[in-house]
């Protein structure tokens, strides 16, 4: 099983940026926790962080075709990353959108996600543990292989 974890703009600043909102855990610490969980269950986990939408799209185009699951925290691209949204829509793997903070308890502009319509599900407000929950959910789809976004939800026509 292959899972991609995509971290959008400014997530490289976790641990320093507004710890009262995003927590004190760094991105490197989050990635290490995720890698440890993945290794324990025999999952290949590839992570990427970029402040540039095009770099995230390049990663998806290179690695996403045979992915069994995608976890994405798009950061600010949540609200305007249409090219990223289109890149995700091309792929067939289940997509879980993760946000460290509860975006619906914050400023109104954060309430709209252009990513959500192509995501299988969304986890918000649970801090770094939201990534672990996403992995656990994807593990429940193990063996279904790429092309199972609708099957994972039981909504395939």
UniProtKB/Swiss-Prot annotation:
Keyword field contains Transmembrane helix: no
Keyword Cell division annotated: no
Example of a GO MF term: 3-dehydroquinate dehydratase activity
Pfam family, one: DHquinase_II
Binding positions for substrate per the UniProt entry: 73, 79, 86, 100-101, 110
Pathway: Metabolic intermediate biosynthesis; chorismate biosynthesis; chorismate from D-erythrose 4-phosphate and phosphoenolpyruvate: step 3/7
Reactions the enzyme catalyzes: 3-dehydroquinate = 3-dehydroshikimate + H2O
Protein purpose: Catalyzes a trans-dehydration via an enolate intermediate.
Family: Belongs to the type-II 3-dehydroquinase family.
UniProt subunit comment: Homododecamer.
The protein's name: 3-dehydroquinate dehydratase
High-level lineage: Bacteria, Bacillati, Chloroflexota, Chloroflexia, Chloroflexales
